[in-house]
Amino acid sequence: MREKLSPHVRALLEAVDAEGRPPVEELSLQEARQAALEGTRKLGGEPEPVALVEDVRIAGPAGMIPLRIYTPEGKAPNPALIYFHGGGWVVCNLDTHDVVCRALARRS
């Protein structure tokens, strides 16, 4: 299966395998969440600066939904991008994808 993946993705998976961590399905929920946070921080590098980061909550059909708004440097109006990453709707969260979202905000 991995032979069908791009060389970059294969290298990423090999780096994760080399750490010798147990498979995510063998971890408790809390362990899986911590591993995801550590892994994304390690692979993502330092977060890039943006003009403003705001954490807000909006009402959803099953309760409040956390959102993070990234405002890039420069004059408005700015483009809008909505980034959904469910992480299986269990493991990942706003912090695990902060580096990615900051990079998207700066380059959009």
Identify the residue ranges that each predicted region occupies.
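A glycine/proline-hinged amphipathic helix-loop "lid/cap" segment
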Residues: 1-69
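Short clusters of hydrophobic/aromatic residues that line enzyme substrate/ligand-binding pockets
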Residues: 58, 78, 94
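A generic beta-sheet turn/junction motif
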Residues: 60-62, 73, 84
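Short beta-strand element of the alpha/beta-hydrolase
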Residues: 67, 77-87
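Short glycine/proline-enriched loop/turn "hinge" motifs that connect secondary-structure elements
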Residues: 73-75, 105-106
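Short beta->alpha connector loops of Rossmann-like oxidoreductase domains
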Residues: 90-91
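Short amphipathic alpha-helix adjacent to the substrate-entry channel of hydrolases
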Residues: 95-108
